Amino acid sequence: MNIAEQMKDVLKEEIKAAVLKAGLAEESQIPNVVLETPKDKTHGDYSTNMAMQLARVAKKAPRQIAEEIVAHFDKGKASIEKLDIAGPGFINFYMNNQYLTKLIPSVLEAGEAYGETNIGNGERVQVEFVSANPTGDLHLGHARGAAVGDSLCNVLSKAGYDVSREYYINDAGNQINNLALSVEVRYFEALGLEKPMPEDGYRGEDIIAIGKRLAEEYGDRFVNEEESERLAFFREYGLKYELEKLRKDLENFRVPFDVWYSETSLYQNGKIDKALEALREKGHVYEEDGATWFRSTTFGDDKDRVLIKKDGTYTYLLPDIAYHKDKLDRGFDKLINVWGADHHGYIPRMKAAIEALGYEKGTLEVEIIQLVHLYKNGEKMKMSKRTGKAVTMRDLIEEVGLDAVRYFFAMRSADTHMDFDLDLAVSTSNENPVYYAQYAHARICSMLRQGEEQGLKPAADLDFSHIQSEKEYDLLKTIGGFPEAVAEAAEKRIPHRVTNYIYDLASALHSFYNAEKVIDPENEEKSRARLALMKATQITLNNALQLIGVSAPEKM
């Protein structure tokens, strides 16, 4: 447990102790102490609504309860400078600022581990995200889903969850047949032969490239081959090509996966039949009008869903149910799916299936990724100027850089539409949040280098009584808030909470830098203490940027 968490725990215990001393409630009647961080700094470092929570038990007005808690509160034990009461009975706590300096050695010693919490307690969580069809380039929605999904995984891991990242390969549906047919057309074209493109065929540059490569490698070998054999080969060849491209693009985007799970394997291993049988055994499947139905309305869906159509073919739902059953059979406690906005209506039926299989209602969580709109020169941009086609993830990275894409996509709540300002993303000004954050890190590294050149090295065993200014305390309070930001981001599944935190930390750093001198030639002890504060800030900022997949440059 880090020093910031210790401070909060001691404060909570002292609030409980004050309640008992005041005779307001028995120990068993005291609710969990909730501490909020006020947005307005003039309202203290922490605030609690304990007085309102106790009103019914104590049979007194919240304001009177608050006064009695304050009267019996031990400020010394909790390192509190002062308390006050606001509104109907909120109690505001102002920390003893000198106590905050204990954070500096704590962060220096923790290093990369600073910010870790154990709210996850080793719970096994599987996060499935991106899962784009392997039939073309990743578009902006996939890119946002990749950035959000990866950041969420990083945050969950930092908060003590055992996380597995998974990509579901849609390699069994009709889209793969269309891929094979599209590759066939481009293969024939590469040999100077004509073949009509299917109506729903894929017309991307990558399909043309596959056709050319096939022609170069195999010549006209497939022209007179049996069509079924030719298409089977093209299906495998095209799928392998597209998957390699997807893996490479995601790797370049700093998005790793632990598992690439093939939909085809569900058919090969009989898992679809097993899932159907499991639902049937529990009485949630029935036959009607020649089709097989899932009684999903039992679990809150607005209508029952077809699993097997009259012609004997499966709907998308049945293999998806089998896939989710397989996830749970692998021992995960929680499933988190990061889906595009077009999947919103699909959520109730999947949650119904999880419940029908005998699992708790909240076992499956779905995070929806809303649409992205690009703006350049204040105007909405629909097509890439380079290709004349829809903008891909690769195009966007080339336009503004990898760090800007990762930061901007992690900056907003995933379930809100996003306007991505391309001009802002490349500007070298404080208005550009990624530049603002990275410049803060580079600025700290510059100060640390200057200190080293003068033989001043930060250390954990210094005299930190030299840390006394308001700007230093503000910076320390922000550093101390990092574990809390990680915990909240993990618990609420909101990785943008970390991005908000990064901005706050960068602001506190820039504000300190503009007001105070780090290295004072006349005072070596003070200089070393401030350099240690800078090192603690650098560690925290670097750790936070890592969570959202953004680099922390030492020079800019």
Swiss-Prot record:
This is Arginine--tRNA ligase. It comes from the Bacteria. It catalyses: tRNA(Arg) + L-arginine + ATP = L-arginyl-tRNA(Arg) + AMP + diphosphate. Its main location: cytoplasm. Its EC number is 6.1.1.19. GO terms for cellular component: cytoplasm. It is found in: Cytoplasm. HAMAP family: Arg_tRNA_synth (MF_00123). Transmembrane segments: none annotated. It comes from Bacillus subtilis (strain 168). GO terms for molecular function: arginine-tRNA ligase activity; ATP binding. Pfam families: Arg_tRNA_synt_N, DALR_1, tRNA-synt_1d. Keywords: Aminoacyl-tRNA synthetase, ATP-binding, Cytoplasm, Ligase, Nucleotide-binding, Protein biosynthesis. A motif ('HIGH' region) lies at residues 132-142. PROSITE patterns: AA_TRNA_LIGASE_I. GO terms for biological process: arginyl-tRNA aminoacylation. Monomer. InterPro entries: aa-tRNA-synth_I_CS, Arg-tRNA-ligase, Arg-tRNA-synth_N, Arg-tRNA-synth_N_sf, ArgRS_core, DALR_anticod-bd, Rossmann-like_a/b/a_fold, tRNAsynth_Ia_anticodon-bd. Belongs to the class-I aminoacyl-tRNA synthetase family.
